[in-house]
Amino acid sequence: ETLRCDCLLCDPPYGLSEAKGKNKSRTKLAVAKDYGTSDWDDEPPSDFDLIRLRDLTKWQIIFGGNYFVLPPSKCWLVWDKVNGANDFADCELAWTNLDKAVRIFHYMWNGMLKENPEYRMHPTQKPLAVCKFALSMAPKDVTSVLDPYMGVGTTILAAKAAGISAIGVEREERYCADAVVRLQQEVFDFGGVNDIQS
């Protein structure tokens, strides 16, 4: 039987090679964090992969939806990064198949300037508040979330905070280890079993 979840909430690689460290130093005012190099975002997922993922869920929220071929949507989620004038994007878009109007979330995330300082462990990590906002837009009857591009587990943490079960998949072992550490800091109650095994 095929695994199914109520909601797909993910931030797939866009194929922009951010993992190569090409944007390590955009300014001389601060030293950018070195995340190492990898090839996980050299290519975006195929159209087939996205269709298959969408088939596994009733509701979908896909960050970077503007980079992919997806059906028309009346509900885009817009994350306004409150950046000011610089060479980073002013906002990020999430495509959805939700039945509501476009929604905007204002949350500063600009290098050292962050609305709520959060340790960044992944080059394309979304703030927890942004994932919580996105998940709050899903229908209230959502009880399970799938994130097949989990990174360091931000979607899983947002689901936990909302009392929603979640499944995360990540191909990079180091990010899985980081996600385990983050999740151990937010321990789930498994009926007396509180250890998360890596």
Which residues fall in each region the model found?
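Class I S-adenosyl-L-methionine-dependent methyltransferase catalytic core
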Residues: 1-146, 152-198
